[in-house]
């Protein structure tokens, strides 16, 4: 590994392996190791929630502030699973029963202050450095929870530190009432539409978008989509105005954890024999007997994920010989719809409501195809798992799905480069046609195996993404 050329402070609300509620944690946890290979040292700063407090005994204090939005805060440093982690210990903000963003009765009422505190400390560390002498050259903020960090650098002085904001999902914008402006240590002079003001209030995400030196999203297509009203969710004008400082960098997946070679019945692109064994085990687990392609659906069961389309397209797919195994949780109505399909198509549809990491591995190992009919998908990891395991992705043409799947049209099949099936628009007729194409492709064994092997050889690790981030950091600090 090269000697570190630069230092980056990554600021986020969650990080694997400490805490995870979604894909954000996977990305934040994977980047330090991937960037180390590119010669960059990244430390991650996140809140010390109640379930993490036991770790403080094994850490050392490297920064503090006596009045951090209502109480004392200190930054504790230590090694966690090979990562240099920084935990913001502020019990008045984070030591409480419940999740990182919400308690038993909904979102925490002081979320604006809780995550402004995270951003404030991040900006101070960037300007002043830690007591162990470490100081970053780049502050990399993730989503609304860290959106104020670039703003604090811009308004209170950056000390030469450059800032990056990554938008993982623009649907979550960190809105707060304008009355909080002074208590959040934001300048009243910047409360106008070109800066902090957002529909009469504040948005930490918008604050980051207008002040960061560079903006990234988690796929090139999503970067373009965010400048359009149907995807920008009110912020499309802000992003379009900064188009020259916006880029899309695809996420990767942990190819050590998500590896068909590491499963109980291992297989590779060179030899797919054991994939059939995994299919048999998967069929047994869901009590299925499927003559055609066995598709899987591993997803949150929500409208955004296009799950409402499944009941409309599934009958024809079942009639043509297909089957479906479902693993997920979400909207009660959609959970009910999945259960109804299981009853209606007994032996061809199996449903598990909830999430089980081990079962998800079996589903990718045994599934012939994975369905990802999302209406919008900033990046998406599910289709990458499908590629890795030779479970052919059938995806809507949006966001990161469009950037990762090579559609099995006649030209791509002739050229021998197809890796999946895409459809557009995200509506039942187009989805149903993609499933018909899946049936026909599956019937041609030689062609099907060729597409499977193409998919499994498609690079989905972090190397390419890390190289892109490293190049961006180098450009910013040059």
From Swiss-Prot:
Entries under SUPFAM superfamilies matching the protein: UDP-Glycosyltransferase/glycogen phosphorylase
GO cellular component: cytosol
Taxonomic superkingdom: Bacteria
Top EC class for this record: transferase
Pathway listed: Glycan biosynthesis; glycogen biosynthesis
EC numbers, comma separated: 2.4.1.21
Residues making up the signal peptide according to the UniProt record: none
Reactions this protein catalyses: [(1->4)-alpha-D-glucosyl](n) + ADP-alpha-D-glucose = [(1->4)-alpha-D-glucosyl](n+1) + ADP + H(+)
GO terms of biological process kind: glycogen biosynthetic process
UniProt cross-references to Pfam families, sorted A to Z: Glyco_trans_1_4 (PF13692), Glyco_transf_5 (PF08323)
Annotated GO MF terms: alpha-1,4-glucan glucosyltransferase (ADP-glucose donor) activity; alpha-1,4-glucan glucosyltransferase (UDP-glucose donor) activity
Presence of the UniProt keyword Cell division in the record: no
Keywords, alphabetical: Glycogen biosynthesis, Glycosyltransferase, Transferase
Binding residues annotated for ADP-alpha-D-glucose, in chain numbering: 20
Family the UniProt entry places it in: Belongs to the glycosyltransferase 1 family. Bacterial/plant glycogen synthase subfamily.
PANTHER family xrefs: ALPHA AMYLASE DOMAIN-CONTAINING PROTEIN, GRANULE-BOUND STARCH SYNTHASE 1, CHLOROPLASTIC/AMYLOPLASTIC
Protein's job: Synthesizes alpha-1,4-glucan chains using ADP-glucose.
Name of protein: Glycogen synthase
């Amino acid at each position: 590994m090269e000697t570190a050329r630069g230092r980056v402070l990554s600021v986020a609300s969650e990080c694997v392996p400490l805490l995870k509620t979604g894909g954000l944690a996977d990305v934040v946890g994977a980047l330090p190791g991937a960037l180390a290979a590119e010669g960059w040292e990244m430390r991650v700063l996140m809140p010390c929630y109640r379930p993490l407090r036991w770790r403080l005994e094994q850490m050392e204090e490297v920064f503090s502030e006596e009045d951090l939005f209502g109480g004392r805060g200190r930054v504790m440093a230590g090694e966690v699973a090979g990562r240099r982690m920084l935990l913001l210990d502020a019990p008045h903000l984070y030591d409480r029963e419940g999740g990182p963003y919400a308690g038993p009765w909904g979102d925490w009422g002081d979320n604006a202050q809780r995550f402004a505190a995270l951003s404030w400390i991040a900006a101070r560390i960037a300007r002043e450095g830690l007591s162990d002498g470490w100081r970053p050259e780049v502050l990399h903020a993730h989503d609304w929870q860290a959106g104020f960090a670039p703003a604090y650098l811009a308004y209170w002085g950056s000390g030469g530190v450059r800032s990056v904001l990554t938008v993982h999902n623009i649907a979550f914008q960190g809105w707060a009432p304008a009355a909080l402006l002074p208590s959040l240590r934001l300048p009243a002079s910047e409360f106008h539409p070109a800066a902090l003001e957002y529909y009469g209030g504040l948005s930490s995400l918008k604050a980051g978008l207008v002040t960061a030196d560079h903006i990234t999203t988690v796929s090139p297509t999503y970067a373009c989509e965010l400048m359009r009203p149907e995807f920008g969710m009110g912020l499309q004008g802000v992003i379009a105005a900064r188009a020259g400082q916006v880029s899309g960098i695809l996420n990767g997946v942990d190819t050590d954890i998500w590896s068909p070679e590491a499963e109980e019945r291992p297989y590779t692109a060179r030899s797919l024999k054991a994939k059939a064994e995994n299919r048999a085990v998967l069929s047994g687990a869901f009590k299925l007997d499927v003559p055609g392609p066995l598709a899987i659906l591993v997803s949150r069961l929500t409208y955004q994920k296009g799950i409402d389309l499944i009941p409309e397209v599934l009958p024809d797919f079942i009639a043509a010989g297909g089957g479906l195994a479902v693993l997920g949780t979400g909207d009660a109505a959609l959970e009910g719809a999945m259960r109804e399909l299981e009853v209606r198509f007994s032996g061809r549809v199996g449903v598990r409501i909830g999430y089980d990491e081990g079962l998800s591995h079996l589903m990718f190992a045994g599934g012939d195809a994975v369905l990802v009919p999302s209406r919008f998908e900033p990046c998406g990891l599910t289709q990458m798992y499908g590629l890795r395991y030779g479970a052919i992705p059938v995806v809507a043409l949006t966001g990161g799905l469009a950037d990762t799947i090579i559609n099995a049209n006649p030209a791509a099949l002739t050229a021998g480069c197809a890796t999946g099936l895409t459809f557009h628009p995200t509506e039942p007729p187009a989805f149903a046609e993609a499933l018909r194409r899946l049936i026909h492709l599956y019937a041609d064994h030689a062609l099907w195996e060729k597409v499977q092997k193409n998919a499994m050889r498609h690079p989905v690790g972090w190397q390419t993404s890390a190289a892109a981030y490293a190049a961006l950091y180098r450009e910013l600090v040059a």
